[in-house]
A protein has these predicted regions:
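Short S/T/G/P-enriched beta-strand
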Residues: 25-57, 62-78, 82-88, 188-249, ...
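Extracellular structured ligand-interaction cores
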Residues: 54-56, 76, 172-179, 200-205, ...
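C-terminal segment of classical bacterial N-terminal signal peptides
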Residues: 15-23, 411
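Bacterial N-terminal signal peptides that target proteins for export
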Residues: 1-9
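Ser/Thr/Pro-rich, low-complexity mucin-like regions
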Residues: 151-201, 212, 265-268
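Short, solvent-exposed linear motifs at loop/edge-of-secondary-structure regions
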Residues: 34-74, 169-186, 285-298, 402-417, ...
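Contiguous segments within soluble domain cores/interaction surfaces
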Residues: 28-165, 175, 200-202
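Inter-heme linker and motif-flanking segments adjacent to c-type heme-binding CXXCH motifs
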Residues: 186-192, 213-249, 266-457
Length: 457
C-alpha cells in the first residue's frame, strides 16, 4: 500500500532558480506537479517528529494529436525524476538531515534511510532520483515518498535561500527543483522534459516553543529543553502522560517519539495509530489535538485572526516562505472595510469553526477539505475521481472525458497558476508562453488554436 505523508502547509518570493523546461519531441508533452504545493518537514529528529522528509511528484505524459491521450505504458515509456539541489553529498553535510538518518530507524522501526545501494531513500523506498511509476487508473506517473529536504548547500543560489532557520543556522532553499524526463524505453530517445517545484519547508514550531521554554526558566533553550517543557505541559492534559519521558528504543535517553504514534494522522499512511507499549492510544487525531490545543487552551491563549500572516503563518511556513502563493492571493472578496485578498480561512473556514464542526477528526478527507465548486461553476471537480487523501481537486480528472488531472493544467493546491513564485510558472510559460493555467489548445491538440482560451472541463 502506498504511503501518503504530507501537511497542509499553506510564497510570495521569486527565487533565483534557473529552471529548464523544454519539449524534446514534438509528439509528446510531459507536465509535472507536486501533490500539495508545500510539504512540511522537521529540522531535527532527536526528540520528536511531526513529519519526516516525504514528498510526492506526479506527471502526465501526453501524446499529442487531434485527440491527445495520456500514456502510461511502462513497457514502452520511462519517466524519470531528479531532485536537482538534493545530492547525497549535500545531505551528508547537512546536520539536520543527518539527525534524520540517525533517528529514522528509531522513529520507524524496520526502516533504514540508507538503501542497499548506499543512496538515501524515503519511507516508501523512493530515492532522490529514479523512475516514476505508471498509474493507469490515474492516467499519470507518480513517485511517492521522495526524501526531499530544504537545501543549505551551494547547489542553491543565495537568492533561492529565502527560508530562515529558527535555530540560527544558515538560510535554506524551500523550493527545490525536480527535473522530469520522458523516454522511449526501447530506443532511449528523449521524448519530453520539464521542471517543476518540489517544496519542503520548516514550520514555525521552534520559533514559538523556544520562547515558551524561556518562560519556564531556560535562559538559552535548546530543542531538548523545549521538548521537556512540552512533555510537562502534555502531562497536564487528560492523558497525564509526560511525552518527554517516553523512551521507545530503551537506550536510557527519552525520545525520539513520533506524535502520530498515539494520535492518528492519516497523512502518515496509517489507518490506526500504532501506539507505544505501555501507553494508551488517543481517540483524537493529531490534527485535532494540535489545532484544538492552540486555539482553545487557556495557557496558550491564542487569539485567532483570519489574516494568514497573523494566524496560519505562525505555524505553517510563512515569513520568507509564504507557502500559500497561488492566484487566489491577489483576488479580492468582500466589500468596504471587510474587503480583503482571499485568505486560508475563506476556503478552509475559521479554525474554531472547523474544530466545532469536527472537521479535524477527519483530516485530509474529501469530506472536510475545500471544494472548488463552492465558489466556481462548471469545475468538473469529482470527474474521474481516483479517491485517496487530500481532497477532490487533487484526485479528480477533467477535460476530454476525464483524462487530464485538474492539477496538470491548474497547478497544485496552494500554488495554482499563475503563482506569485516565479519558479512555479516556468513550466506553463515554456508550454504555452503564459503563466496562466494551460489554455492554449495546441499545447496538446495538433492543428488547434494557438490563442489562449478556457478549455471545457
Amino acid at each position: 500500500m502506498k504511503k501518503k505523508i504530507a501537511v497542509g502547509c499553506l510564497a510570495l518570493a521569486a527565487t533565483g532558480a534557473t529552471l529548464l523546461t523544454s519539449t524534446a519531441h514534438a509528439d509528446y508533452k510531459v507536465i509535472a506537479t507536486n501533490d500539495l504545493g508545500m510539504h512540511c518537514v522537521c529540522m531535527g529528529f532527536d526528540t520528536f517528529v511531526l513529519l519526516p522528509p516525504f514528498n510526492t511528484l506526479r506527471a502526465q505524459l501526453i501524446q499529442r494529436g487531434e485527440d491527445p491521450v495520456p500514456v502510461t505504458d511502462g513497457s514502452r515509456f520511462k519517466v524519470t525524476y531528479d531532485i536537482v539541489q538534493n545530492t547525497e553529498a549535500s545531505l551528508k553535510a547537512d546536520p539536520y538531515y543527518q539527525s534524520w538518518v540517525t533517528n529514522a530507524p528509531k522513529l520507524f522501526p524496520g526502516f533504514n534511510p540508507v538503501a542497499a545501494n548506499g543512496k538515501y531513500q524515503g519511507l516508501t523506498g523512493s530515492q532522490l532520483r529514479g523512475e516514476m511509476t505508471p498509474d493507469s487508473q490515474g492516467a499519470m506517473w507518480e513517485v511517492v515518498g521522495v526524501p526531499a529536504y530544504p537545501d543549505m548547500s551551494s547547489n542553491s543560489t543565495t537568492a533561492q535561500k529565502i527560508m530562515t532557520d529558527p535555530l540560527g543556522g544558515p538560510n535554506r532553499n524551500p523550493y527545490l527543483t525536480a527535473s522530469v524526463k520522458a523516454y522511449d524505453r526501447a530506443t532511449g530517445a528523449l521524448l519530453a522534459q520539464t521542471t517543476t517545484v518540489v517544496p519542503a519547508a520548516f514550520g514555525g514550531c521552534c520559533g514559538c516553543h523556544l520562547n515558551v521554554a524561556k518562560s519556564y526558566g531556560y535562559a538559552n533553550p535548546t530543542p531538548r529543553d523545549s521538548f521537556n517543557v512540552m512533555g510537562m505541559l502534555h502531562a497536564q492534559n487528560s492523558s497525564h502522560i509526560n511525552i518527554a519521558t517516553i523512551d521507545p528504543d530503551h537506550d536510557g535517553v527519552p525520545g525520539p517519539i513520533r506524535c502520530s504514534q498515539c494520535h492518528l494522522d492519516p497523512a502518515m499512511g496509517e489507518s490506526v495509530a500504532p501506539g507505544y507499549a505501555g501507553y494508551p492510544v488517543s481517540q483524537y487525531t493529531f490534527s485535532d489535538v494540535l489545532h484544538r490545543w492552540h486555539a482553545q487552551n487557556s495557557v496558550v491563549l491564542t487569539n485567532y485572526d483570519p489574516n494568514i500572516a497573523k494566524d496560519c503563518y505562525q505555524c505553517h511556513p510563512g515569513n520568507n516562505v509564504n507557502c500559500y502563493r497561488d492566484g487566489h492571493t491577489t483576488s479580492t472578496i468582500g466589500s468596504g472595510s471587510s474587503a480583503h485578498n482571499i485568505w486560508c480561512t475563506d476556503c478552509h473556514g475559521d479554525l474554531n469553526q472547523r474544530i466545532a464542526q469536527g472537521q479535524m477528526l477527519q483530516p485530509w478527507s474529501d469530506t472536510t477539505l475545500p471544494k472548488c465548486a463552492t465558489c466556481h461553476s462548471n469545475t468538473g471537480e469529482g470527474g474521474g475521481y481516483i479517491g485517496g487523501l487530500f481532497g477532490k481537486y487533487l484526485n479528480s480528472h477533467g477535460h476530454r472525458n476525464d483524462k487530464i488531472l485538474c492539477s496538470t493544467c491548474h497547478g497544485e493546491p496552494h500554488a495554482l497558476n499563475p503563482s506569485t513564485l516565479a519558479a512555479d510558472n516556468t513550466q506553463n510559460i515554456a508550454l504555452q508562453g503564459l503563466a496562466n493555467p494551460i489554455g492554449v489548445c495546441d499545447t496538446c491538440h495538433t492543428g488547434k488554436s494557438s490563442n489562449y482560451g478556457t478549455p471545457p472541463h
